[in-house]
């Protein structure tokens, strides 16, 4: 085989042995398989997992052992070559973090859950949890590996049995919310236990902002993953839980993660119809509108608007949002500005408000909503959004010029019922 092959897109020749035989790309994390052939880790892992391939791609010999051994020598040579060719636009490949070893994961979980024994202490258990968190931060693969070793059950036990140790609570909670959900009902042991729900609620007021955010994240995970309506209601049937979550959104120094987790959790809690009045009493309408007018990104804006629409489906919600001076202008401005989903939720909230009181119909018309709605009907937004626009146009017919010329067309023939999203 030739020592060098034709360049890809760098304008220079890449040494043949620096390229992965599968992807033909410069290797970022070279590993050697049992046949002695070296590949880029991502490529050989994909080769083995897709189609259940059990042969070496180059030699066609059976892969009797799937252990991947890092080729540090080759990786250093590639890094040196990258540095030597920096003037040609080649960036040095980073030194990859090695994936977690199953044996190490088992040992660390055992150490973290140990209660008695030689050298067992809160400090040693917390250190084990921190190492596991480090593995979890590195990659999705590590998170899946940790979860596969019954980590969720172990961490739940630590979290709710070691309540006197703030260090163990914060570390176990932080790791728990990083792991993937492997079973639909794996958090039922939390949602079905009022004491555990109450403890999580108390953590929303912890002195550590990280613990508060992680507590909110776990509440969102538990609420979303709970199928029983009664258990969902038991989680959100508390003004304290709403106050704690809303405080994450209210805090002027909230981090981007705090805002994202806060709105996700608020939406999950407000999905329970029977407890939406608690969110309204806790001040959700004012905080949502203030945040929407300030610093949500697109995804968070969509979720916040969906929450606004949910709360506007109650009379007290309409009243609270309607009294905020920015609500109607902000909702009108959002239409066709952010995304199709945001447009749909904004239109749904406006529909609820305009159905409730004439003064909000007048305010919406004054803010230019009729033109926005006419554009919505002709746009490529969702059918649900168009139906909401059509209903709003019916309600606002007195604000239309020449209403009778097209009010009865097929485009606007629909009922006035709020369409669920």
Curated annotation (Swiss-Prot):
GO terms, biological process: defense response to other organism; protein ubiquitination
GO MF entry, a single one: ubiquitin protein ligase activity
Substrates-to-products reaction catalysed: S-ubiquitinyl-[E2 ubiquitin-conjugating enzyme]-L-cysteine + [acceptor protein]-L-lysine = [E2 ubiquitin-conjugating enzyme]-L-cysteine + N(6)-ubiquitinyl-[acceptor protein]-L-lysine
InterPro entries hit by this protein: ARM-like (IPR011989), ARM-type_fold (IPR016024), PUB22/23/24-like (IPR045185), RING-Ubox_PUB (IPR045210), Ubox_domain (IPR003613), Znf_RING/FYVE/PHD (IPR013083)
Residue span, U-box domain: 13-88
Enzyme class, broadest EC rank: transferase
EC assignment: 2.3.2.27
Name of the encoding gene: PUB25
Pathway: Protein modification; protein ubiquitination
Function of the protein: Functions as an E3 ubiquitin ligase.
Protein name: U-box domain-containing protein 25
SUPFAM superfamilies the record matches: ARM repeat, RING/U-box
Keywords, sorted A to Z: Transferase, Ubl conjugation pathway
Annotated CDD domains: RING-Ubox_PUB (cd16664)
Pfam family, one: U-box
């Amino acid at each position: 085989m030739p020592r060098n092959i034709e360049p890809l897109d760098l304008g220079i020749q890449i040494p043949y042995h620096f390229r992965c035989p599968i992807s033909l790309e410069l290797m970022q994390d070279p590993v050697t398989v049992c046949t002695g052939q070296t590949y880029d880790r991502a490529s050989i892992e994909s080769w083995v997992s897709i189609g259940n391939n059990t042969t070496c791609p180059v030699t066609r010999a059976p892969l009797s052992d799937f252990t991947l051994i890092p080729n540090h020598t080759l990786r250093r040579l590639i890094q040196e070559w990258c540095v030597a060719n920096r003037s040609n636009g080649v960036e040095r490949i980073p030194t990859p973090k090695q994936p977690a070893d199953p044996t190490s994961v088992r040992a660390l979980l055992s150490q973290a859950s140990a209660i008695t024994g030689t050298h067992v202490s809160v400090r040693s258990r917390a250190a084990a949890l921190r190492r596991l968190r480090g593995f979890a931060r590195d990659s999705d693969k590590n998170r899946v590996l940790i979860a596969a070793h019954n980590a969720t059950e172990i961490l739940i036990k630590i979290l709710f049995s070691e309540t006197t140790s703030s260090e163990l609570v914060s570390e176990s909670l932080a790791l728990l919310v990083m792991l993937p959900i492997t079973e639909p009902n794996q958090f039922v042991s939390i949602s079905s236990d009022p004491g555990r729900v109450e403890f999580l609620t108390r953590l929303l007021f912890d002195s550590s902002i990280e613990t508060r955010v992680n507590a909110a994240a776990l509440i969102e995970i538990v609420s979303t993953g709970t199928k029983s309506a009664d258990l969902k209601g038991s989680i959100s049937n508390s003004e304290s839980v709403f106050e704690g979550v809303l405080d994450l959104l209210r805090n002027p120094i909230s981090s981007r993660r705090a805002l994202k987790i806060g709105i996700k959790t608020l939406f999950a809690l407000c999905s329970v119809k029977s407890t939406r009045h608690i969110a309204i009493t806790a001040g959700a309408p004012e905080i949502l509108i203030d945040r929407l007018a300030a610093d949500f990104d697109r995804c968070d804006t969509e979720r916040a608007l969906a929450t606004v629409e949910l709360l506007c489906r109650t009379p007290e919600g309409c009243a609270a949002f309607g009294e905020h001076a920015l609500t109607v202008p902000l909702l009108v401005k959002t239409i066709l500005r952010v995304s199709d989903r945001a447009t749909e939720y904004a239109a749904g909230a406006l529909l609820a408000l305009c159905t409730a009181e004439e003064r909000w119909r007048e305010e919406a018309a004054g803010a230019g909503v009729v033109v926005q709605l006419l554009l919505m009907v002709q746009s490529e937004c969702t059918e649900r959004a168009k139906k909401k626009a059509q209903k709003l146009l019916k309600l606002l017919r007195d604000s239309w010029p020449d209403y009778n010329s097209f009010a009865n067309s097929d485009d606007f023939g629909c009922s006035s019922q709020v369409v669920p999203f």
